[in-house]
Amino acid sequence: YIILPTERPPLYARTCSFSCVRAYGLEIKASGKINIGVFSDKNPFGYVDENGEYQGYDIYFANRLGKDLGVEINYVSTEAANRVEYLETGKVDIILANFTVTEERAEKVDFALPYMNVALGVVSPDSNVITSLDNWKAENKMIVISGTTAELYLTKNYPDIKLQKYDSYATAKSAIENGNGVAWANDNTEVIAFAKQNKGYTVGIDSLGSQDTIAPAVSKGNETLLNWINDEIKTLGKENFFHADYDATLTDTYGADYKETLVVEGGEVKKS
């Protein structure tokens, strides 16, 4: 069939040639590449392996997007605090970097349908496990990564807690290991992974605040790309794609127990 400039290709066309991408009006370089912002140090979601290849839950999804768009992916390493900026400045077309949907962020970027559930969690050394924030000692510091939901939540809801802020997952990880704070607050998926991968730490609080979702994000007003991603997520749900993604990238860290808790299939969040 011939795709006219105003016509959207049918969802059964699983591989979309670059001409098809242009039919969506997407501003992707004529070279046939799409720039996707991901983490490079956040195993098992987005990280660079020993061979210099990007791996993880977000990467598995990104690879499928590139395949179905029919374009090459240019991965752009990002930190949490840069995710909005990279979209606003056009450095990336999509952010797939454990991006929690919040009202504040939605004022600056457009979120697609979700693909994972998340809450906040707090990890601390076994020698002093933090199980509550209600009796926080004034001299203690909480480690957070700048630009994360954890920083925003604690600043708003626990203003008396001193925050020790770091720019990246790697530096925050080093900080808790070096005792620069009594605990580390981050997405519960990430602190659970940290505790499982590093002996001597316990997630004393595994669900802090509200239950949220993680979703792809595009620049504000980029409806063509947003609509394509939403259609793609719905279609992938029919093949249980994100369950397969979990099996391939997260099972070694979380086991099978967390699968139904974390995975969102087809963009539909199940009511608990």
State where each predicted segment sits.
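Flexible hinge/capping segments at coil-to-helix
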Residues: 124-142
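Ligand-binding cleft/hinge of the Venus flytrap
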Residues: 48-49, 62-71, 150-167, 195-196, ...
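Short helix-initiation/N-cap motifs at beta->coil->alpha
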Residues: 74-85, 146, 164-178
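Extracytoplasmic small-molecule ligand-binding "clamshell" domains
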Residues: 23-98
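Ligand-binding clefts/hinges and TM-proximal coupling segments of bilobed small-molecule sensing domains
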Residues: 22-23, 149-166, 203-207, 233-272
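Short, solvent-exposed loop/beta-turn-alpha elements that line the ligand-binding surface or hinge
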Residues: 45-60, 133-135, 261-272
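Periplasmic-binding protein-like
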Residues: 116-126, 188, 192-233, 252-271
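A ligand-binding cleft/hinge motif common to bilobed small-molecule-binding domains
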Residues: 85, 99-107, 156, 177-211
